[in-house]
Design a protein with these regions (language model features):
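Canonical positions in the second alpha-helix
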Residues: 564, 597-598, 631-632
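Structural detector for internal amphipathic alpha-helices that build alpha-solenoid repeat scaffolds
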Residues: 435-446, 467-480, 490, 498-512, ...
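Amphipathic alpha-helical scaffolding segments comprising HEAT/armadillo-like alpha-solenoid repeats
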Residues: 448-459, 481-493, 511-522, 545-562
Length: 651
């Protein structure tokens, strides 16, 4: 039995005697019909979509889709040369594979259109990898997306590594109706999709029932498929509901972990399908500005725009993906003397004017986005803007060392200079008070004292965005005590699922009986992300005498967690979690296999290597411990932690 199945079987031994029926995998959803079918009626929308990034998110290689120079040219980076050429009508990339041998791979797919285009190669049947030398569409050149930081072979971030497996990490957001179909036993993929590229049905849902309605609307009294509307679609955007629209976009435009299979039916609530990353160090700056490749949703949730009901389509055409107006006009549709009656909280005022921005009209400094949407560059050349739409806070940047939009242009000046300038120009501004970023920065620096109280205060402040409050609770995890967990317990009933899930996680710090009592309501929470957070805390809890209703809720939540783990059996992170679970359940051999699978996928996971060494030592397998350490050092020869373990084993 593969160890992932063994582990989940052990997990469910906890529920012996409790009746639990796994959620059925039914065929009660409509079938996909393809974007070409949709275009038969929706011509204008289809025409706008044809030139969009969505339409070109994943394409078959061919003369009309491949823009890179495959004319036999070479590209050398850090001493390794890659050749791009064609043969027998195919496009090929010749490069060094993991064993160090040169090998030619046929291009199996094309990803993206601008500002760069990447190419997919099949390294084994059914498994696609994203090649890291990409085509720069602007300068018409090959370049490495990591620049001087290019990872070496055997690194998890190398183009052959698990974090670059298209099937696992990318395809669900570059295709319509994608099914990964990873077999943990054979470690093989048999992926399939309804359509490559992000087609109509990726957002609107499978169209079988809708086309039946379109053919005979008079005869279409009721959809034969549960969960579809009067026109046969699983999601209805016509009502203009913010949650419906924004959460549909957020499924891909966010840094998140899939709870389901990564391909939820459109209309599925975000927190039933995903767990959103909080404002963690390495992902976001302390003040919430984007840092790593976190996409849009996490920053948009911090914005006043989101808080006041703004939807993606207020600024972006949903079919072309382009802004609905040029330049500042996209902002002045609301931020102007006439304001916009759809958003009554707006202040009617002249913004697109030197009296507000203090720059020459027509210059970059006069553009709203220059001051309110700071830009970061990813993948070497891809500039993306922060969607928290924040008021510049150079005073905060001077304190925390966070980016300041003023200094993006005025590079010769300091943040303190910019703060002084803004104070002169806006002497009565209300935007210079305390900020959660100050608390987060102190917590990240492991400041002691009252920082726990400060984080709790942020978490309890209902006027802060939910993602900020949840992030405060997340920062409490390393310093949590039973007292802090008790203080946070009331937030398990918070209106925001991000806050509820984070408050549940903190209850790990309290005694088992008390913990169980607190998390019981969360096992039946409306959001799956909260239920799964509660299920994680059931291991070791006194569940033997649960009332039947409570036991069923616990079994359901645990089943959802089990399914979430199984859906990510090709992720190294999953096996780290699995190994930890096995240790809690006192199954050392299962734990070793889990940690070994994690390091097979990503040899740079030093902690997983160390756990293998420690467990083997604990069970008296010194030879196995020595062998695991040797393998760990081969992959990480300079790691000080592993070097220390070598000295310890040598004694």
């Amino acid at each position: 039995m593969p160890f992932i199945r063994c582990l989940t079987a052990l997990l469910f031994c906890v529920w012996s005697g409790i009746a639990f029926a796994e959620e059925k995998q039914t065929d009660d959803a409509p079938d996909y019909v393809g974007s070409a079918t949709c275009a038969g009626c929706h011509e204008a929308e289809a025409a706008a979509w044809q030139s969009s990034h969505h339409a070109k998110a994943w394409m078959e290689p061919g003369p009309d889709t491949v823009d890179g120079d495959f004319g036999g040219v070479t590209f050398t980076h850090k001493g390794k040369t890659t050749r791009f050429f064609t043969r027998d009508g195919g496009y090929y990339i010749e490069t060094t594979d993991v064993p160090g041998e040169r090998k030619a791979f046929r291009v199996a797919g094309v990803g993206g259109i601008t500002p760069l285009q990447q190419y997919l190669v099949e390294t084994e049947p059914g498994k696609l990898q994203t090649f890291d030398v990409a085509w720069d569409q602007i300068q018409k050149r090959w370049y490495h997306i990591y620049g001087d930081q290019a990872p070496p072979p055997h690194d998890g971030l190398h183009w052959t590594g698990p974090y670059k497996t298209w099937n696992a990490r990318c395809a669900e957001c570059h295709a319509t109706g994608f099914e990964k179909n990873y077999d943990a036993t054979t470690r093989k993929y048999s992926s399939r999709q309804a359509e490559i590229s992000v087609g109509c049905e990726a957002c609107h849902g499978p169209g079988e029932a809708h086309t039946a309605w379109a053919r005979e609307p008079e005869a279409y009294a009721k959809s034969p498929f549960p969960g579809t509307d009067r026109t046969g679609l699983p999601v209805d955007f016509s009502q203009g509901l913010q949650t419906t629209e924004v959460e549909q976009c957020a499924g891909c435009h966010s840094r998140r972990e899939a709870l389901l299979d990564g391909n939820p039916l459109p209309g599925t609530p975000f927190h039933d399908a995903y767990r959103l990353s909080p404002l963690r160090q390495g992902l976001y700056h302390a003040d919430g500005q984007i840092l790593d490749e976190v996409y849009v949703y996490g920053s948009f949730l911090q914005s006043k725009m989101f808080a006041n009901g703004v939807r993606c389509s207020n600024c972006h055409d949903p079919h072309s993906g382009q802004l609905i107006a040029e330049g500042n006009a996209v902002c002045t549709q609301c931020h102007s003397p006439s304001a916009n009656e759809a958003f009554p909280a707006l202040t009617a005022k002249l913004y697109d004017d030197p009296s507000h921005h203090f720059h020459e009209p027509g210059t970059p400094g006069a553009e709203c986005k220059s001051c309110h949407m700071i830009e970061r560059t990813y993948m070497g050349i891809d500039g993306r803007r922060d969607h928290s739409f924040r008021v510049p806070r150079p005073d905060l940047s001077a304190k925390l060392g966070t980016p300041d939009t003023c200094n993006e242009c005025h590079t010769e000046k300091s943040a303190s200079w910019a703060a002084d300038e803004l104070e002169k120009r806006f002497p009565n501004s209300s935007h210079r008070g305390s900020h959660f970023g100050e608390v987060f920065a102190a917590a990240r620096q492991n400041t002691t004292g009252a920082i726990g109280d400060d984080l709790l205060a942020v978490a309890k402040q209902g006027t802060f965005p939910g993602i900020v409050r949840a992030s405060a609770l997340d920062l409490l995890m390393p310093r949590a005590t039973p007292e802090i967990a008790s203080e946070a317990a009331a937030l398990i009933g918070d209106p925001d699922p991000l806050v509820r899930a984070a408050a549940v996680a903190l209850q790990q710090q309290v005694p088992p009986a008390e913990k169980l009592q607190r998390i019981v309501p969360a096992l039946s929470d409306p959001a799956q992300s909260v239920r799964v957070a509660a299920a994680r805390l059931l291991i070791g809890a006194p569940i033997a005498h649960m009332p039947d209703k409570m036991a069923k809720a616990a079994a359901r939540a645990s089943g959802e967690w089990q399914k979430s783990l199984q859906n990510k059996a090709d992720f190294p992170e999953t096996h780290l979690v699995s190994g930890g679970l096995a240790l809690v359940m006192r199954r050392p051999q299962v734990a070793v296999r889990a940690f070994a699978e994690a390091t097979r996928l990503d040899p740079q996971l030093v902690n997983a290597w160390v756990m293998q060494v420690r467990i083997r030592m604990a069970v008296g397998d010194m030879g196995g411990a020595q062998l695991a350490l040797q393998r760990a050092l081969l992959a990480n020869p300079d790691d000080p932690n592993l070097q220390a373990w070598r000295q310890q084993l040598a004694q």
